[in-house]
Swiss-Prot record:
Keywords: Aminoacyl-tRNA synthetase, ATP-binding, Cytoplasm, Ligase, Metal-binding, Nucleotide-binding, Protein biosynthesis, RNA-binding, tRNA-binding, Zinc. It comes from Rhodopseudomonas palustris (strain HaA2). Transmembrane segments: none annotated. It catalyses: tRNA(Ala) + L-alanine + ATP = L-alanyl-tRNA(Ala) + AMP + diphosphate. This is Alanine--tRNA ligase. Its EC number is 6.1.1.7. One of its GO terms (molecular function) is ATP binding. It comes from the Bacteria.
C-alpha cells in the first residue's frame, strides 16, 4: 500500500467507511475566494461552509485536494529542488467535520489511520498542541498513550490557526515522525527544528472560536474540524526514503526525464531533475484547470514555473524543447485520480512545446540585450537592477543567468533595485487577479438562499409565468417594500427569467400586478442558485408575498438563444478546422452579438475562418432539431459532451445536442455538437438564421477570440458591407468584382512612387548644405577639433536608409564622423552616427549617439563603436542634437 495512488485511495476509503462523503478536488483557481491566487489547502472549497454562509448536504467530508504554492503569501518556488520536502504542487489529504464530531473523534480517527491502516510505529511519532490546549493533550494521552514528553506544547501561531483577522479560528495539533538520527534536525520547538529529521505530515485544526474583533474571541456554537495531510510526505514516510523526490511517483517522472535526455542525474545536477519533475506537475495541472502562461496574475506565476523548469532542462543539455515530451509520464501516473489531466493532455503538451520554443528564442535575445546594456561597464561596476528585471520580466531572462553572464567580467547586479522592481510587479500581479466565484461579503444573498432555498427556473419551457415575491433588497439590505422610482432587487419563488451564467447575459422584461410594474434590467445568480431580478419600480409599490405576472422580453431572448446556439456550432467547427486541442476559455452571449474565447497558439488565417463559418452555416441550413437531456455528469462526459474548463458541475447535468450529420470520426450518437450547458437555445438550428464571423483577435497568450453575429444582425452587417463595397467601387470607377484588381494596381503604383520619392530624398540629403532635403539648412562637412564632421538634419528618411547614408558618408569622408538626424511626420527624431575605422579608438559612435539622444528626449541608444543609432520624441531639436555631437567631438 506504499504507492502514492494506494495511499490516496486508502485515506479516502478509510474516511468514507467512517461516514464521510468523498468530495472531488476543487480547481486550482479558487471559485469562491478572491483573496487567493491558487487553491493552497483542502479547506479552501469549504470556506463558506465553515463561516456559515453555505450549507452542504453532508456534515462530514474527505478530499484529496490538488494545491499549488508558488505565489502570494505561500510561495515555495525558490526552494523546490534544493530541499527534501518543498514542492510547488502537492496533494493535501483531509477530513472535515462541519459541526459534527470534534476534537476527541478527530484525534481518534487520525490515530487509527496512521497506526492501523498505514502501520506507523508509535515510538517514532510525537505531536504538538497549542500551549493552552489541555483538552487536546489529554486526548492524545488517552487515545495514543503518549507521555508528556511526546506531547510538545507550542505557544506560537504555528499551533493556532485563523482564517483571517476575524472569523473561525482555533488551536491545532501537528503530528510528526522521527526519520532517524542520520538526518539533521531536532524536535519542534528546539533550536534545530528546521532540520528534516522530525517531519510534520498531518495538521489537525480544531475550529472552536470566532474572532469577533482583535481583542474579542467567542466560542463557536458548533465547533468544526479541518485537517490536512501532505500525500507526498506520507509516501516519503511509508516508502522509507529521505526525500519526497525519492518516492515512486517522482522516481517515475525523473526516469522519464532521464530517458528523454539520454542520461541520468549526477550529484552536481540532481536538483535540476527534481525541479523539472515538480514543475511538470504544477504546470500541467494549472494548464488543465484553464491557466495559460502570460505576463500578469496567475498566468505570470505559471510562466515563472514553466521557464524555471525549462532553464534547468537547458542546463542539463536539452537541445530541443523537453517538458512537453514528459507529459505522458505524468498522465500515466496521475490521470486515473485526476481525469482532467487526460482530457487536457494534448493542450498541455502544445502549450509547453510553444512556451519552451519561445523561451529559447528569448534566451538568445536576452543575451544580446545584456551584451548591449553592459557594453560600457568595466570590472567592479554594478549592473542596473531595473534593467536586470526588465530582462527577466519582459524577455524571460532569469536573474541567475544575468549574474552568471556578468560574473566572468567581474560585474555584479544591483539586487536591491531588482527586488524593488520585482515587488512592484508582484503588486501589479496581485491586483490583476480576481476570484471566479462570489465574494463571501455578499452575506445578504447567502442568508436569503438559506431561508428561501433555490429559485425554480421555468425559462427552458416558457417566457411568461406567475410568481410570488419572496424577498426585496435595496442597497444590500432586505426591505419590506419598493415604491415607484425605487431601484432594487426582487427574489421570486419561481421565474422564467434566465440569470446570467455560462457567458449568457441575464434576461430583461417586466414584472407586473395589480397597480404595480417593475422593469427588470438584469437578472443575476447569487449564492449559487438564487435568481435575483434587478431593476426599477415604474408604478405602485411592491411588497413581499405579492403575486406578479412575469414576462421576459421575447425578442431579446430569441436573439440571445440564436447567439448561444451559434457559439456551440462555432466551437465544434473550430475543433474540426484547427484540431482537437481547441478548448473553450470563455464566451459572451448577448442579444446583438457573441464572442467565443478558446485555446489556440497562433492567429487564425482568413481561409480557416471562412471554413469555420461555412461549416457552422451548413448546420444552420440543415435545420436540425436541437435537443436537451438531463444526464449523469460521468455519463455525459463518457458520451463525448464537451465541458468548460474550471466550471463546476453537479451530479446531473443538462446536455445540449445539435446537428445529426456525422461529419468526422469524433461525432457521437447524441449529435454533431454536444456540450454541457445550462443556457437557453433555439428549437432548430435553422432558427439561428445566419452566422457571420466579424472578427478574430488575441486576448491573452495562447487564447484567441472570434466575434460573430447571427440572424437579423448578421443580415444587417452583410447588407452594410455590400453597400460599402458598392460605394468604394464607384469611387474607384470600377465594378465590385473588379475592385481587388483595381486596388492591387493602385497599391503597386503607390509603391513605385514611394520608392522614387525615397530615392529623391536620399539624394537631396547627401547633396550638400542648403539642399532641399535639409530640415533647416543643416551644416556641410566641417572640421571640429581637427576631425571632419558631416552633420545634417533631414526629413522623411527611415532609419534603415539613414544607416546606408551614413555608410556612404563614411566613404566620402575617408576619415571622420557622420551624424544624420531624421524627423518623422509625427515629430519624433531618429539619429544614426558613424565613425570611420581610424577614429574608433578616439570616438565611440555609441557614446556620441547617446549624447544626441538625450537632447531629443530619449534615454540612450545602442550599436557598435563604428555605427550606432538612437531616437527621441522631440525631433524639433534635431539641430541641437547635432550641435551636442559637435561639442562632444571638440571637447
Amino acid at each position: 500500500m506504499s504507492g502514492v495512488n494506494d495511499i490516496r485511495s486508502a485515506f479516502l476509503n478509510y474516511f468514507a467507511k467512517n461516514g464521510h462523503d468523498i468530495v472531488p478536488s476543487s480547481p486550482l483557481v479558487p471559485r469562491n475566494d478572491p483573496t487567493l491566487m491558487f487553491t493552497n489547502a483542502g479547506m479552501v472549497q469549504f470556506k463558506n461552509v465553515f463561516t456559515g454562509l453555505e450549507k452542504r448536504p453532508y456534515q462530514r467530508a474527505t478530499t484529496s485536494q490538488k494545491c499549488v504554492r508558488a505565489g502570494g503569501k505561500h510561495n515555495d518556488l525558490d526552494n523546490v529542488g534544493y530541499t527534501a520536502r518543498h514542492l510547488t504542487f502537492f496533494e493535501m489529504l483531509g477530513n472535515f467535520s462541519f459541526g459534527d464530531y470534534f476534537k476527541e473523534r478527530a484525534i481518534e480517527l487520525a490515530w487509527n489511520l496512521i497506526t492501523k491502516e498505514y502501520g506507523l510505529k508509535k515510538d517514532k511519532l510525537l505531536v504538538t498542541v497549542y500551549h493552552t490546549d489541555d483538552e487536546a493533550a489529554s486526548y492524545w494521552k488517552k487515545i495514543a498513550g503518549f507521555s508528556d514528553d511526546r506531547i510538545i506544547r507550542i505557544p506560537t501561531s504555528d499551533n493556532f490557526w485563523a482564517m483571517g483577522d476575524t472569523g473561525p479560528c482555533g488551536p491545532c495539533s501537528e503530528i510528526f515522525i522521527d526519520q532517524g538520527e542520520h538526518i539533521f534536525g531536532g524536535p519542534p520547538g528546539s533550536p534545530e527544528e528546521d532540520g528534516d529529521r522530525f517531519l510534520e505530515f498531518w495538521n489537525l485544526v480544531f475550529m472552536q472560536y470566532e474572532q469577533v474583533t482583535k481583542d474579542e474571541r467567542l466560542p463557536l456554537p458548533r465547533p468544526s474540524i479541518d485537517t490536512g495531510m501532505g500525500l507526498e510526505r506520507m509516501a516519503n514516510i511509508l516508502q522509507g526514503v529521505d526525500s519526497v523526490f525519492e518516492t515512486d511517483l517522482f522516481r517515475s517522472l525523473i526516469d522519464a526525464t532521464s530517458s528523454a535526455l539520454g542520461r541520468g542525474p549526477g550529484e552536481e545536477d540532481a536538483a535540476s531533475f527534481r525541479v523539472i519533475a515538480d514543475h511538470l506537475r504544477s504546470s500541467s495541472f494549472l494548464i488543465a484547470d484553464g491557466v495559460l502562461p502570460s505576463n500578469e496574475g496567475r498566468g505570470y506565476v505559471l510562466r515563472r514555473i514553466m521557464r524555471r523548469a525549462m532553464r534547468h532542462a537547458q542546463l542539463l543539455g536539452a537541445s530541443e524543447p523537453l517538458m512537453w515530451r514528459l507529459v505522458w509520464a505524468l498522465v500515466r501516473e496521475m490521470g486515473q485520480a485526476y481525469p482532467e489531466l487526460v482530457r487536457a493532455e494534448a493542450m498541455i503538451e502544445e502549450t509547453m512545446r510553444l512556451e519552451e520554443t519561445r523561451f529559447r528564442k528569448t534566451l538568445d535575445r536576452g543575451l544580446a540585450i545584456l551584451d548591449e546594456k553592459s557594453a560600457s561597464l568595466k570590472k567592479g561596476d554594478m549592473f542596473d537592477g531595473d534593467t536586470a528585471f526588465t530582462l527577466y520580466d519582459t524577455y524571460g531572462f532569469p536573474l541567475d543567468l544575468t549574474q552568471d553572464a556578468l560574473r566572468n567580467r567581474g560585474i555584479s547586479v544591483d539586487i536591491a533595485s531588482f527586488t524593488d522592481a520585482m515587488d512592484r510587479q508582484r503588486a501589479k500581479a496581485r491586483a490583476s487577479w480576481a476570484g471566479s466565484g462570489e465574494a463571501a461579503t455578499e452575506t445578504v444573498w447567502f442568508g436569503l438562499r438559506e431561508k428561501l432555498g433555490a429559485t425554480e427556473f421555468l425559462g427552458y419551457d416558457t417566457e411568461t409565468a406567475e410568481g410570488v415575491v419572496t424577498a426585496l433588497v435595496a442597497d444590500g439590505k432586505e426591505v419590506d417594500a419598493l415604491k415607484a422610482g425605487d431601484s432594487g432587487a426582487i427574489v421570486l419563488n419561481q421565474t422564467p427569467f434566465y440569470a446570467e451564467s455560462g457567458g449568457q447575459v441575464g434576461d430583461t422584461g417586466v414584472l407586473s400586478g395589480d397597480g404595480v410594474r417593475f422593469r427588470v434590467t438584469d437578472t443575476l445568480k447569487k449564492a449559487g442558485d438564487l435568481f435575483v431580478h434587478f431593476g426599477t419600480v415604474e408604478e405602485g409599490a411592491i411588497k413581499r408575498d405579492a403575486a406578479l405576472q412575469l414576462d421576459v422580453d421575447h425578442a431579446r431572448r430569441s436573439s440571445i438563444r440564436a447567439n448561444h446556439s451559434a457559439t456551440h456550432l462555432l466551437h465544434e467547427a473550430l475543433r474540426q478546422v484547427l484540431g482537437d486541442h481547441i478548448a473553450q476559455k470563455g464566451s459572451m452571449v448577448a442579444p446583438d452579438r457573441l464572442r467565443f474565447d478558446f485555446v489556440h497558439q497562433k492567429p487564425i488565417t482568413p481561409d480557416e475562418l471562412r471554413r469555420v463559418e461555412d461549416i457552422a452555416n451548413d448546420i444552420v441550413l440543415e435545420n436540425d432539431e436541437v435537443t436537451t437531456r438531463l444526464m449523469a455528469v460521468d455519463d455525459a462526459r463518457e458520451a463525448g459532451a464537451r465541458a468548460l474548463f474550471g466550471e463546476k458541475y453537479g451530479d446531473e447535468v443538462r446536455v445540449v445536442s445539435m446537428g445529426k450529420t456525422a461529419r468526422d470520426s469524433g461525432s457521437n450518437a447524441l449529435g454533431w455538437s454536444v456540450e454541457l450547458c445550462g443556457g437557453t437555445h433555439v428549437k432548430r438550428t435553422g432558427d439561428i438564421g445566419l452566422v457571420s464571423i466579424t472578427g478574430e483577435s488575441a486576448v491573452a497568450s495562447g487564447v484567441r477570440r472570434i466575434e460573430a453575429l447571427t440572424g437579423r444582425y448578421a443580415r444587417q452587417s452583410a447588407n452594410a458591407a455590400i453597400n460599402t463595397a458598392k460605394q468604394a467601387a464607384a469611387e474607384l470607377r470600377t465594378t465590385v468584382d473588379d475592385m481587388p484588381a483595381r486596388i492591387a494596381a493602385l497599391m503597386e503604383e503607390r509603391k513605385k512612387l514611394e520608392r522614387e520619392l525615397s530615392d529623391a530624398r536620399k539624394k537631396l540629403a547627401m547633396g550638400g548644405g542648403g539642399a532641399a532635403g535639409a530640415a533647416d539648412g543643416g551644416a556641410d562637412v566641417r572640421e571640429v577639433g581637427g576631425v571632419k564632421l558631416m552633420a545634417r538634419a533631414v526629413e522623411g528618411i527611415e532609419i534603415k536608409d539613414l544607416k546606408s547614408l551614413v555608410d556612404q558618408g563614411k566613404k566620402q569622408l575617408g576619415s571622420g564622423v557622420i551624424a544624420l538626424v531624421a524627423t518623422s511626420e509625427d515629430g519624433k527624431g531618429s539619429i544614426v552616427v558613424g565613425v570611420t575605422p581610424d577614429l574608433v579608438a578616439r570616438f565611440s559612435a555609441v557614446d556620441l549617439v547617446r549624447t544626441a539622444s538625450v537632447v531629443l528626449g530619449g534615454k540612450g541608444g545602442g550599436g557598435k563603436p563604428d555605427m550606432a543609432q538612437a531616437g527621441g520624441p522631440d525631433g524639433s531639436k534635431a539641430q541641437a542634437a547635432l550641435d551636442a555631437i559637435a561639442a562632444a567631438i571638440g571637447g
